């Protein structure tokens, strides 16, 4: 018996093949265990006001509109989210945010969510002004109507129209409900004119500095100009209103509502900031070990064909004797 055991020990090929067979059997059994995993719910809010049509965002080496960039980066974020995460898509205009649906699971509904983002259009606006600050209260109210709580990822350039002053600045001192909301800044800090389009999405000029109806972010058809749209545009390049990503304001707003800000130019930074947002709930996730045991089965199967002496002889054949 001892001699038989010694014989087996000396036969490395038999040992490797046996181990490969054992691991293969275990892989077929597919042992599993469960572990707790944080699950997140989100609402991606995309600013669709006209200032988001400013072409100062860089995508694949060319300048595109802020809205197009916001849609692209939000789709890239969506691709990185793990299964069981739930996402809703919201649109911001005026003083409020409209959700297309309550948060739905990303893997089962990826195509639907992706298409929703793709179809976002500035012509869907329902109000003519852009009051980002005032939208905080309405957004918190919207989230409270969801079946489950959701974290906010807000894609915007920070443009307020009309500009904030003492009489129209919303008091957020008592505001609650925005903890850890993430503001993603879209655009650049170089002044760029805001294009003005007609209702067929044809360029007719640029927003001017003077005309109230053409203030940055004001939509063509709104409560301010219902009954007719002002087609006036800036008469000269010097008269064009220059729009910029207002990072200073977005950082200040984020701090005021106990949220966070990140520049939208870096996908990794956005994902990193999202990981810091608290999860909505914890779930039992099943972890399968089949792939691990299959790997070891393959490894030991391959090892039976190799030995140190065989490797040395192969090296000698290739490179010659040293």
Label the predicted regions.
Residues 43, 253-293:
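Juxtamembrane amphipathic/hinge helix adjacent to a transmembrane helix
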Residues 39-40, 52-86, 105-109:
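…and closely analogous acidic/polar surface helices at protein-protein or active-site interfaces
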Residues 57-65, 99-104, 120-128, 236-241:
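Second-shell loop/turn segments in exported
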Residues 1-37, 276-322:
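C-terminal signal-anchor/stop-transfer transmembrane helix together with its immediate cytosolic
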Residues 86-119, 142-143, 273:
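Short beta-strand-loop
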Residues 32-50:
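Alpha-helical transmembrane signal-anchor/signal-peptide segments
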Residues 158-242:
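VWA/integrin I-like adhesion module and closely mimicked acidic/polar interface patches used
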Residues 24, 47-49, 89, 139-143, ...:
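DG-centered beta-turn motif at the end of beta-strands
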